Amino acid sequence: MELLRSGLPSYYYICKLQTEYDMENRLTVGFTHGDVNGIGYELIIKMMAENRICEVCTPVLFGSSKVAAYHRKALNIENFSLNSIQNARDANPKRCNIVNCVDDAIKVDLGQETPESDDAAVLALKAALTALDRNEIDVLVGAPQGCNSFKPAASCPVFFSERYETRNVMPLLVGEKMKMGFVTNHLPFRDIAGNITVNNIYYKLKLLDACLKKDFTIRKPRIAVLGLNPHSGENCMYGEEEKNVIIPAIERARDNGIMALGPYAPDGLFSGVEFEKFDVILAMYHDQGMIPFKTIEGNEGAVLLAGLPIVYTSTVHGMAYDITGQGIADESGMRNALSMLNYLPYNL
């Protein structure tokens, strides 16, 4: 099997794999269009314009035919069309399909986040999740959309946590060289330390361990836990969270059979290749994990929302308003999110 170092198969291996199965066994993959003013449609159109996507899955986009046509024209992409359907169950396995769930009167304002684009993003997401809950699609990949679109929920993980009434939902970043999880996610910096608790760290370690065993078939995941303070506290010289919170959480995890190690100072762990000895890294907060991940993996990584009863992935990057409509967005992250969607269900 042609595996990337992350343990996931490459997109083109998935193409080869799926052709060994008949159409009836192929996954129906839902896509949400994300922010209509961002690069979401560009990523989707570029990926769907490759005929091989129908060797991978039956694709169903939840969005707007009018907006899709607008972006296709802006990108000057010829010989591409979407098959409009009323219900995902009616999807043609040999075509790229679209379920129109957004008002055609929506105004596209490239490069700008607007209340209208936020509403359109969450409308498409809710329509896709309803289809997923009804088993009309098997799995879902989301194009980039802003946090404002999830209001009143504070972020994407909170939105999904509330919808599926589950406490522990965590974005797991997956790249070729590393995987990264988080104890806290979108919080003001002043609130981070107060949310670093023994229980919070332990439950995230437990979630990571279960996810890597079930979804990535790693028998005994090695988890590197990052410290919170400079030099991991330097024997409490720069803070006591390592001694009083992080180490007790690691010990509790190890007592329960989880191979958690640390805490490690991020500058030491990421300065060379030491991080490659671990199956996954647990960061204490958003930027602590996101910066090294994007530095090493670029925008080619994908995000799996761990802890859900459904399978949902997305890209690691945002709407990229600064390059919207220019035709230069890299669809690799979306392609890798699709690869992961097609692989993970075999282990569910």
Annotate the PLM regions:
Residues 6-7:
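N-terminal polybasic/positive-inside topogenic patches
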Residues 23-241, 247-348:
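Anion-binding alpha/beta catalytic cores of soluble intermediary-metabolism enzymes, centered on
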